[in-house]
């Protein structure tokens, strides 16, 4: 046993001596030249591949949002020093060669590169810049590869979101921020960069836009050059999907410009608008603006609340057509019967009209906006059925759009109604709605009684242009008969033809609409604030078969403009005119538009020469172009 122990000790000693000798030969003699440029790092480094965030396009394919990636490039001074010795040139000469290779291929100059390389001799690795774009990086890498230059390393630095039209649809599109996901087991990295949506569409569709990380294994030689090596693994990144919106950027611009103009003219605190196709639920424009938006950085505006889905207002008299809808759908009123209007007392409260109208038919109750008349009709409907009708129209709940920040509005449960709630709700008091809710409800009046699910994204594509998801029009429910909806729409047409909105009547298209003026509720919902109003208008065109439903409102317009007929309705008309006279508009026939063109010169200010020519050609104007483009 003792001799076996001695043998083991002897064998172990011999092996130790051989291993030590082998290590000495490798480090001192270096027969395989591991110290030269053929030496590589056999332990692969895992490089994270950052996906590009998806883009956003309008309904016409115009780019609204895109991303630019930036990379950081560094120079390994030790690798450059080895290379300089091998080439028998000074270190300064080597730095000059590298500086020239970088400077001529990106925005930073050769002089700036050289300054950074020579600024601090104690640094082994020097950061040159972290603002190199992808195309610039490709040129720099090609230059280094072509001339076998040493020391260059690069890594992803950041991504910038580009909103190509700045303020346009800013609140709707939303914003992003850079975040780190922390430690990732697969890539074994601790700081995984990504842009994450924080509001608007950027937040709502973040999982589609964000993409998926990838990684690849890389090895380097002694001069920190990437080397080909067999059996390296990788998982390619997956770029984010692209959103193709229902929003028409041209219509969106028309709406926003009209609202900004209205804010100035009417002295309002905020304004909002929604335009929908009532037959599909497509949202053609969604805009919310405040007076100071244009003075702010667009990035600040993008994080502000999306007014059409978050701002609540009492709908006022624009609720009257929907109360009438509830009555007509149950055959509780006859078109030719009369209701005594003027003054009416309910539970000690006085309901009155702005004028002593006497007896009015249902159509005149809507066209003249009689509070008394609609309150009496609401009594026929009853609390239960009016409540159920308004719930079915979508009030007190979100629309199904699922847009970040959307409010469900305020609509009391039936159990909480008192003896006066039926009457106040009938003319739009005691409840609060969003512009989107209101537009969705009136789409049912426009399309024969169907509540359409509103949507903003038409389809989604991958980075190869393949459609991965498409939104199809969806009927959520039938809320009334077609006959009831058509009758209410004819009553709304009477509002424009001979009622409270005759000043927006057009010769070239029929308009159905309803004005509304609502006092602003005090904080906590108890009582109203003196002199504070919301001006509202709901309109649809053409009246006989609407292709467009629009809701406009102003928050606290100045006295005199607080009536819906004096601010919201004129804004509706301005927007309508500008949309109908846009090239390729199919809402009204070309020959009908020519009728109006003889009366009104289109606004061409700020238009590109080609766009201006297209508009003038469509009008049939003769014109002469002078000066440069």
Question: Which ranges hold each PLM region?
Answer:
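Periplasmic/cell-envelope proteins involved in peptidoglycan metabolism and beta-lactam response
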Residues: 1-296, 384-394, 504-507, 524, ...
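Beta-lactam-recognizing serine transpeptidase/beta-lactamase-like catalytic domain environment
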Residues: 65, 220-234, 238, 247, ...
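Extracytoplasmic Gram-positive cell-surface binding/anchoring modules and repeats
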Residues: 312, 594-629
């Amino acid at each position: 046993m003792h001799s076996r122990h001695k043998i083991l000790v002897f064998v172990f000693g011999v092996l130790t001596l051989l291993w030590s000798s082998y290590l000495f030969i490798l480090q001192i003699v270096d027969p395989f030249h591991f110290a030269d440029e053929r030496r590589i790092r056999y332990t692969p480094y895992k490089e994270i591949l950052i996906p590009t965030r998806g883009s956003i396009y309008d309904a016409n394919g115009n780019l609204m949002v895109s991303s630019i990636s930036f990379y950081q490039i560094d120079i390994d001074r030790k690798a450059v020093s080895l290379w300089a010795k091998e080439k028998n040139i000074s270190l300064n000469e080597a730095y000059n060669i590298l500086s020239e290779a970088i400077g001529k291929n990106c925005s930073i100059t050769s002089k700036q590169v050289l300054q950074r390389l020579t600024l601090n001799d104690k640094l082994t690795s020097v950061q040159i810049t972290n603002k190199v774009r992808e195309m610039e990086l490709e040129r720099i890498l090609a230059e280094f590869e072509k001339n076998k230059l040493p020391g260059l390393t690069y890594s992803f630095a950041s991504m910038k979101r580009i909103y190509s039209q700045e303020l346009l649809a800013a609140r709707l599109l939303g914003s992003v921020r850079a975040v780190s996901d922390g430690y990732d087991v697969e890539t074994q990295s601790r700081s995984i960069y990504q842009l994450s949506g924080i509001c608007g569409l950027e937040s709502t569709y973040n999982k589609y836009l964000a993409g998926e990380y990838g990684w690849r294994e890389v090895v380097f030689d002694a001069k920190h050059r990437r080397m080909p090596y067999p059996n390296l693994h990788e998982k390619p990144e997956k770029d984010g999907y692209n959103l193709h919106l229902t929003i028409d950027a041209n219509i969106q611009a028309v709406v926003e410009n009209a609202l900004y103009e209205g804010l100035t003219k009417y002295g309002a605190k905020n304004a909002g608008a929604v335009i929908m196709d009532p037959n599909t639920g497509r949202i053609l424009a969604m805009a919310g603006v405040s007076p100071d938006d244009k003075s702010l950085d667009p990035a600040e505006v993008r994080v502000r609340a999306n007014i059409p889905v978050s701002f609540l207002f009492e709908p006022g008299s624009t609720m009257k057509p929907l109360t009438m809808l509830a009555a007509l759908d149950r055959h509780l009123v006859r078109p030719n019967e009369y209701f005594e209007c003027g003054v009416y007392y309910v539970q000690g409260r006085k309901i009155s009209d702005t004028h002593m109208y006497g007896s009015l038919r249902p159509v005149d109750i809507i066209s003249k906006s009689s509070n008394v008349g609609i309150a009496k009709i609401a009594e026929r409907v009853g609390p239960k059925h009016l409540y159920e009708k308004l719930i079915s129209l979508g009030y007190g709940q979100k629309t199904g759009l699922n847009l970040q920040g959307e409010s469900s509005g305020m609509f009391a449960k039936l159990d909480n109604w008192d003896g006066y709630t039926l009457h106040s709700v009938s003319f739009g008091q005691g409840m609060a709605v969003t512009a989107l809710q209101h537009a969705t409800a009136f789409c049912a009046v426009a399309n024969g009684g169907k509540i359409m699910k509103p949507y903003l994204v038409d389809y989604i594509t991958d980075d190869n242009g393949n459609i991965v998801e498409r939104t199809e029009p969806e009927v959520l429910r039938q809320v009334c008969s077609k006959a009831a909806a058509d009758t209410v729409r004819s009553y709304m047409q009477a509002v424009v033809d001979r009622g409270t909105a005759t000043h927006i009547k057009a010769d070239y298209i029929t308009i159905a609409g309803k004005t509304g003026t609502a006092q602003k509720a005090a904080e906590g919902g108890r009582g109203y604030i003196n002199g504070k109003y919301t001006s509202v208008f709901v309109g649809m065109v053409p009246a006989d078969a609407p292709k467009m439903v629009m809701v406009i409102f102003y928050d606290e317009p100045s006295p005199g403009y607080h009536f819906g007929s004096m601010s919201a309705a004129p804004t509706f008309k301005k927007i309508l005119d500008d949309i109908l006279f846009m090239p390729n508009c199919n809402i009204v026939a070309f020959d009908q538009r020519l009728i109006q063109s003889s009366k009104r010169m289109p606004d061409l200010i700020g238009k590109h020469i080609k766009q201006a020519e297209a508009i003038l050609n469509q009008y049939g104007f003769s014109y002469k172009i002078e000066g440069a483009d």
